[in-house]
Amino acid sequence: MQLLEQALARFAEVYGRAAEAADVVDHTACTLATCSASGWPQVRTVLLKGYDERGFAFYTNRHSRKGQALAENPRAAVCFHWAPLAEQVVIEGVVTPVAEAEADAYWAGRPRESQIGGWASHQSRGLESREVLEQRVAEYAARFPDGEAVPRPPHWSGYRLAPVRIEFWRARPGRLHERDVYEHTAEGWCHRLLNP
């Protein structure tokens, strides 16, 4: 088995356990870290919507702060921390937009109210009042009546984080935690243990 395949299989195993754990609120939630062109770090929680050998996919408004940061600097990291399992996985890599057809397919499966919200929210921009947002929601709900498909806004899409580093961490007594990392180097993928 190739080392990247091995890392993805390990991720699938712990991700599956997190999905089944009753005390994990949302196993898909991860912290996305980006850095703007000016060097300011930014973090927020996103939801993983799929992963394979190409990378880890999430969806958002391209005009949001994270969309702008990724346009300026496509290097990013995500951290899955499943406290009830005492495990975490950190993935670093380069982010690219998903294909338009892939974004369309994901959008089509979203609940209608989320689709309307995707049109109505000017994500990360200032908001005069909650009433203004609710008015825009009502306007878009009228524009796209029940029973009709809500098209994907041009500013709404997905991103895929192609990994160059995947680190696994598991808590152990005495803070002698288990850590190991898969990294892509000039020679290909390598695997090594890390001190806690």
UniProtKB/Swiss-Prot annotation:
Positions bound to substrate: K49, Y106, R110, S114, R175, L176, H177
Pathway participation: Cofactor metabolism; pyridoxal 5'-phosphate salvage; pyridoxal 5'-phosphate from pyridoxamine 5'-phosphate: step 1/1; Cofactor metabolism; pyridoxal 5'-phosphate salvage; pyridoxal 5'-phosphate from pyridoxine 5'-phosphate: step 1/1
EC number: 1.4.3.5
Binding site for FMN: 44-49, 59-60, 65-66, 88, 123-124, 169, 179
Reactions listed under catalytic activity: pyridoxamine 5'-phosphate + O2 + H2O = pyridoxal 5'-phosphate + H2O2 + NH4(+); pyridoxine 5'-phosphate + O2 = pyridoxal 5'-phosphate + H2O2
GO biological process: pyridoxine biosynthetic process
Keyword Oxidoreductase set for record: yes
Keyword tags: Flavoprotein, FMN, Oxidoreductase, Pyridoxine biosynthesis
Keyword flag Flavoprotein: yes
Enzyme class: oxidoreductase
GO MF entries: FMN binding; pyridoxamine phosphate oxidase activity
Cofactor(s) this protein cannot do without: FMN
InterPro entries for this protein: Pyridox_Oxase (IPR000659), Pyridox_Oxase_CS (IPR019740), Pyridox_Oxase_N (IPR011576), Pyridoxamine_oxidase_dimer_C (IPR019576), Split_barrel_FMN-bd (IPR012349)
Entry note: cofactor: Binds 1 FMN per subunit.
The protein's role, per its UniProt record: Catalyzes the oxidation of either pyridoxine 5'-phosphate (PNP) or pyridoxamine 5'-phosphate (PMP) into pyridoxal 5'-phosphate (PLP).
Similarity-based family: Belongs to the pyridoxamine 5'-phosphate oxidase family.
Subunit: Homodimer.
Name assigned to this protein: Pyridoxine/pyridoxamine 5'-phosphate oxidase
Organism of provenance: Alkalilimnicola ehrlichii (strain ATCC BAA-1101 / DSM 17681 / MLHE-1)
